[in-house]
């Protein structure tokens, strides 16, 4: 099966990108830092809220595309713990926009067999938002298609702190002898327990930082950074990121296959191969 059988291209560029994609080598989990809504609006002399509304349209297209490509998991960074520092009017608008999105898009999400999950300190969100999130997760709980994970009131360091506190609670309840602290134990107590770690981390707006997002989980993720601001991140740009991902040789801290063969032939111990190269791809569009 070709990816073009899963997704009908809207134009020639999309058709060419789909031809390059191998449906058997798509990532299991794509995580996205959706950055640039405010700058998008400012460049057009519009209020920041206009950028956030445009960003919702981009998110809708990315969600639909990933679901049609049968990606198992997509995580979107929607609202960080630090975002509370923004002007009160902007924060209130973002909360209303989230509720509008859930009410409007939930039937489509459900129809496409997508399961909605929310990670973060949701107990600190407004009551109405919490209720709408709980209803949406309940209605999609039995869906077996793509998992759409929305990071709300989320921070990577806070997630690790919450995981460590959960492990301490486990020790208090069951005793230290029944617990072993290792990487798997930490993963099992994260908000994302049971989900695969991201294979591909996409960041828009050209910023070269991870912004306290999935700090534990992205240890071996491939990074794709594009200059596009989030509202301009189209389906073609997503396909471009997936094509780039499939060109990568994932090393997980080791040597590339070619270097590994050379080191073995020369009797080298390969110690330098423990330094993992980060791949930062820039798309100079826009």
Where are these regions (language model features)?
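Flexible, compositionally biased loop and terminal segments
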Residues: 1-286
